[in-house]
Design a protein with these regions (language model features):
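Interdomain helical linkers/hinges and coiled-coil/dimerization scaffolds
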Residues: 101, 107, 113-146
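Alpha4 helix (beta4-alpha4-beta5 surface) of REC/receiver domains from two-component response regulators
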Residues: 71, 92-107
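Two-component/phosphorelay signaling modules centered on CheY-like receiver
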Residues: 6-10, 17-38
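Short amphipathic alpha-helix used as the core "switch/output" element in two-component signaling
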Residues: 48, 70-81
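Active-site residues of response regulator receiver
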Residues: 15, 61
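Receiver (REC) domain active-site loop signature in two-component systems and cognate sites
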Residues: 64
């Protein structure tokens, strides 16, 4: 049973527009694998969820009230460098993408989201998460052995 729980990925969707969050949840539901999906309508709320839950993947917009997606990414990565963050934005301004890269964001995707592109970036991020979980599991087993 513990092995099954290890395969579940905790995902946080952050967007101030409910319809956008619903759209991303729908696209996620079409992907293979099991996920716990959390939602936040701004970066401030998202940071609280990241701190209280074991979030492994964040899907966030950039422009939101209280704290934008770039500031959220910066703060979240400071607290959890292993966190996978995918930014979905309607802004094609290269400075946003540059800043996202500087903060260690996994991917930067333009809206409207192409389902095929979504599939590719989710698979890539979840593969990194699964590899990290396996590595942590091996390290724990190694410590228990000693």
């Amino acid at each position: 049973m513990k092995n099954m729980a290890n395969k579940i990925i905790n995902v946080l969707i952050v967007d101030d527009e409910k319809i956008e969050r619903e759209g991303l949840k729908y696209l996620l539901s079409r992907e293979e694998g099991e996920r716990n999906v959390f939602e936040a309508s701004n970066g401030k709320q998202a940071l609280q969820i990241i701190r209280s839950e074991d979030i492994q993947l964040v899907l966030t917009d950039i422009k939101m009230p209280h704290m934008d997606g770039l500031e959220l990414s910066r703060r979240a990565k400071e607290e959890n460098p292993a966190l996978q963050i995918i930014i979905f934005s309607g802004y094609s301004d290269f400075t946003f993408a540059q800043e996202a890269i500087r903060y260690g964001v996994t991917e930067y995707i333009l809206k409207p989201v192409n389902p095929e592109d979504f599939h590719k970036v989710i698979q890539k991020a979840e593969k990194v998460i699964e590899q990290r979980k396996k590595k942590e599991s091996r390290e724990i087993k190694g410590k228990n052995f000693l």
